[in-house]
Amino acid sequence: MDVNPTLLFLKVPAQNAISTTFPYTGDPPYSHGTGTGYTMDTVNRTHQYSERGRWTTNTETGAPQLNPIDGPLPEDNEPSGYAQTDCVLEAMAFLEESHPGIFENSCIETMEVVQQTRVDKLTQGRQTYDWTLNRNQPAATALANTIEVFRSNGLTANESGRLIDFLKDVMKSMDKEEMEITTHFQRKRRVRDNVTKKMVTQRTIGKRKQRLNKRSYLIRALTLNTMTKDAERGKLKRRAIATPGMQIRGFVYFVETLARSICEKLEQSGLPVGGNEKKAKLANVVRKMMTNSQDTEISFTITGDNTKWNENQNPRMFLAMITYMTRNQPEWFRNVLSIAPIMFSNKMARLGKGYMFESKSMKLRTQIPAEMLANIDLKYFNDSTRKKIEKIRPLLIDGTASLSPGMMMGMFNMLSTVLGVSILNLGQKRYTKTTYWRDGLQSSDDFALIVNAPNHEGIQAGVDRFYRTCKLLGINMSKKKSYINRTGTFEFTSFFYRYGFEANFSMELPSFGVSGINESADMSIGVTVIKNNMINNDLGPATAQMALQLFIKDYRYTYRCHRGDTQIQTRRSFEIKKLWEQTRSKAGLLVSDGGSNLYNIRNLHIPEVCLKWELMDEDYRGRLCNPLNPFVSHKEIESVNNAVMMPAHGPAKNMEYDAVATTHSWIPKRNRTILNTSQRGILEDEQMYQRCCNLFEKFFPSSSYRRPVGISSMVEAMVSRARIDARIDFESGRIKKEEFTEIMKICSTIEELRRQK
């Protein structure tokens, strides 16, 4: 079918067509190899932007540190990180003046959160730098390892289960002269296989104790591990992102809680809301500027871009902001919030895996770990790498680079938004005291600036003043990449505004298709994505119907479940045909069992099992929804599940979909190969962790939404719960006296064992 593509756009306004130029179809680019080079780039760039600052040495770790704060004012347009403390504090004061009580109220809200947050908050999140093993781990495992090490070193405040008490342990750990940790290592030995009589390498996992002195421990506690950001579209070069360890995470969480609470009260902030709510909020600001500029004024909007936002931000500036925002608050609260920026001022960047060398002639490959970069001969490297290493060498300690200025990606999104909004806030007429005034939108490093003035000269003056104000706070608006236009057409966080926000549908493209979880979840997610896009993103009925047909086709190819009467031969077609022939009511078969598709755009909100329930054969229904079916390892399914959708940019979104537990909701088994690697010890820890949690959930069925509060340990809580339940069951006659006595005896034994331990 040949279509002339230009015909498609005859009636479409340019703003709608622009979404087709976004690089969101096909697979995104992934990075291979190490991120060491990208990390060195980040460290070197960050120091270059602040190069005229003051050098000092950290007395504890010996790391050289560069402090650009209150440094020389810029004389050119080059990006720079010389924020001026007094300017930042003044911007904060004006922000408070135009929003009376904003900091006070947010502090009160945050204090409540601090008192109530449980330590399991830190198990959220993906890969985390695990300082005990010096590499990345799933967040829950990294937290468990940290707590285990803390307890074996006599730090036990965390046993209360409150995050704030865990953070007290972190503070104490930094004062200790040494910390003892358990590390995993691999032993390899050659043994003869009994069956094949060949020599094979046998790997065993050992655990050994290791002592870290204060300096080594501090370096690890302040380390951010770096990786390459994957799946970034529309970029030629990759870049590094950081993952902090458990010591830093809790403190960052509380700072961001305060900043989030402030952002919610600021009309110019694009965070923390999203989706339609965000569009409505932003449209309000634009409407205000347009209605006020009707007759005498002209109005222009800048689609803004900042140069290297995080690399010019400075943790010391954030410390000044926090000190100001919490100035009338209790001492303990101010201390808790000031620790994150202090740790970031002393942060170390781990350089990753190092470099891989291969010799074509000798067919050899060898890895040069990051720790060796400090003293290896540079003749092996090409020019650009050699320059990088020479530049970074003075900053290296044990394979990590001292990185005092700059913030790594994504750490303080909310707080940096507050900083950006404080500049926009200065644009009101009462502050500019001239004929022009301005407003705008800020979302992390992305901004849109709206300037109103009687004439073009006024607009230019307004933009210039904004540009210079930004420089004073360490923000660098890029003159090359920012674009000015009559108000009414601009772009902000990939939303295109044209007298109202257009749907940028192309950004949703990656989430269409088959997710690959299991047959049940995939069907549910697929139709939910189509439904959501009809609601939120202008997906019209005809296109939605087509999307649905394509999805069903894709689904059938993925799971090889073509209709029972099809001619297509696949690995499953034999079984599916057999089922088709012996089924009386063929309309009741699920698509994944070779049934036909009953979905259309009107019933996308109904799970497939419910849609076909009345049409199913009795015995098919019984097999499909049989919890005792031995061929299926079930997960316990809540009525609503969450899928993690990766939108085209921005953080992964949680998408809810209806889940009906059937024999199609299977979980694939773990790959065997992991069991022979050094990961095995970790896997065993993880399984034990999982078992404990499952057991706990059995005792407290409601614990999925309410954690038992109090100082007791998990075991104590379960024992006391068992006693209460047993007594109730005994008194109501549900269990016999013998059973009751036995339960009580087991409880006493458990307590006795705990005492002996």
Curated annotation (Swiss-Prot):
Cited Pfam families: Flu_PB1 (PF00602)
Entry keyword Transferase: yes
Keyword Nucleotidyltransferase assigned: yes
GO biological process terms held by the UniProt record: DNA-templated transcription; symbiont-mediated suppression of host gene expression; symbiont-mediated suppression of host mRNA transcription via inhibition of RNA polymerase II activity; viral RNA genome replication; viral transcription
Positions occupied by motif Nuclear localization signal: 187-195, 203-216
EC class (word): transferase
EC number: 2.7.7.48
Domain RdRp catalytic: 286-483
Membrane-spanning parts: none
Role played: RNA-dependent RNA polymerase which is responsible for replication and transcription of virus RNA segments. The transcription of viral mRNAs occurs by a unique mechanism called cap-snatching. 5' methylated caps of cellular mRNAs are cleaved after 10-13 nucleotides by PA. In turn, these short capped RNAs are used as primers by PB1 for transcription of viral mRNAs. During virus replication, PB1 initiates RNA synthesis and copy vRNA into complementary RNA (cRNA) which in turn serves as a template for the production of more vRNAs.
Protein family (similarity comment): Belongs to the influenza viruses polymerase PB1 family.
Self-association and partners: Influenza RNA polymerase is composed of three subunits: PB1, PB2 and PA. Interacts (via N-terminus) with PA (via C-terminus). Interacts (via C-terminus) with PB2 (via N-terminus); this interaction is essential for transcription initiation. Interacts (via C-terminus) with human PKP2 (via N-terminus); the interaction competitively inhibits the interaction between the RNA polymerase subunits PB1 and PB2.
Protein name according to UniProt: RNA-directed RNA polymerase catalytic subunit
Native source organism of the sequence: Influenza A virus (strain A/Fort Monmouth/1/1947 H1N1)
